[in-house]
Amino acid sequence: MDNTANFNPTLPPSIVLPPGFTASVFAQGLNQPTGIAFLGNSSSFQVFVLESGHGLPSVCNDETLWPGGVFDINNPFTPDILVFNQNGTRIRGPLGKPTSTGGGFQPSGPAIDIAFVNGTSGGPLFTTDSNQSTHTHNGNNNSSRISTVNPMTGQFTPFITNLPTGDHPTEQLAFKDGWIYWSQGSTTNSGVVGLDNGGGANQSDIPCQDITLSQNVFISSLSPFVATSGYSPFSKQQPGATIPAFFNSFTGQVRQGVCDGAILRAQLSNSSNIQAFSWGYRNPYAIRFPPDDHPLAGGLLVGVDGEDERGARPTNGVPDRLELARQNPDGSPDYHGWPDRFAFLPSSQAVFNPVGGPADDLCQSPPNSPFPACIPDVLANDVPVADVLAFPPQQITAPLAIEGADSSFTGIDFVPDAFVTDPVRPGAVLYTLEGDFGFSAPNATPPAPEIGHEVKLVNFNQVSGSPLALRIQNFARNPSGMEQAFIVPNLNGFNRPLNVRFGPDGCAYVVDYGAVRDLGTDSHFVGPPANGPLVQIPGTGVIWKICPM
């Protein structure tokens, strides 16, 4: 729709790396890739790339408006899987395209992850998808699912269906000891259904344990007065109510083990045996098990995306965080504090107070005053950020580390020995920060570069008798001050690095979602303002390959 972006993947990569590493383009011209998996060994392997389809709520990202129709195999806004050989030549696909008979991925998307049960050795290929993307109607509620996909034909077999879906769907996958684990993001931004949730039509969050609500309600409209309790349908006020574990207010039913803002798991041999492994997160998007000989062994490393300035309980400046999930000895999930603790600090801390933004409920006109005239109403009614719960359901686990607000934790992987070259040490982690979507002001003040749109390195230092220390540093990013690469002519670098996985060859494969016009006024796009925000530009996705020299 007449939007353009600077994008030229034929240029030499502009990515800044430590000495001793090199970056190249493995695959380009992709449509919003989110996941990657490998099959084979170092001498011969295949690369499976998941294209997510319609992943963001914009008028331009609409699979139904594609000239060939929703079920056109070339529709860039529906999910699929592409298969490449180890040299980057496409050998199969698109696989799993939605069909009129209901086969393949769900057409609205997004699809988030793909993974083989046995890693590069194969086994069943699993994927996650939903109809979450539009955020505008009840049809996306409980639409998330986990399926298996035939890696040759793309034939789908649903494994677990009707999982919670709202602001965040079912996301990344991991496997261990006969169980499949997945990240199940919260259905709301901060525990309350607001106008940002399909005008209030989307489902409320589902707790993993019995909870008691606080006396607080959260206002979406002043006239008429509309307010909502946490973990409740839009406009329902129930101060002090007890919400039982796994109660889905949209269906009115309890489904054992199914909740959100959580890490869930199910037996591979019995998909109906679902358990909550860990909870109290907003969006625990990125998950990865450490090697068995790692200092973090026994836990699950989780990258969490923090709260936004939007909705009925807006916040500002909330950091993203790196957490370690461990199920309690009695089989109950451990708890990490959401929705009332942000990186272990109380939500009422002044640093998290909203400043007023165009996505806040009290700035939606009608029924409220438009932005920025609404700011006094936000400051009068949404400050401080009040508690959703009367008290935590159990002791709160603190994060291992925090990252910049809105930097967006989206991918984690542990380095293989072949990647260990200074400054990378054995047992280190690479993680991706996708970057913000413009709900708040940039998380850094110029000339300092904004945090995000990059890959970072964590080394774990453990000296006998001393606590484990995390050493975090930049690893791969665009030249200083550059965010998404498409904003600068003649720059060939990251736009939205969304995932990272190590291949059988020992190299890091970084999944770059591509160019996205964000919510900020500094959109960097050429095109009619009515087309934005959150416009996806098909064909700008890239798989980057980073290797030791």
List PLM regions with ranges:
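Beta-propeller domain segments
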Residues: 1-16, 59, 71, 133-134, ...
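Asp-box/WD-like beta-propeller blade repeats and closely related beta-sheet repeat scaffolds
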Residues: 96-117, 128-176, 184-188, 202-215
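Hydrophobic core register within WD40 beta-propeller blades
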Residues: 36, 114, 173, 284-287, ...
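Predominantly a core beta-strand signature of beta-propeller blades
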Residues: 22-23, 88-92, 154-159, 272-275, ...
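Blade-loop segments of beta-propeller domains
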Residues: 34, 60-120, 125
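Conserved loop/turn at the beginning of each blade in beta-propeller domains
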Residues: 19, 29, 74-77, 97-110, ...
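Structural WD40 beta-propeller signal
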Residues: 29, 39, 115-119, 174-176, ...
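Short coil/turn segments that connect the beta-strands within blades of beta-propeller domains
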Residues: 43-45, 122-123, 177-178, 297-298, ...
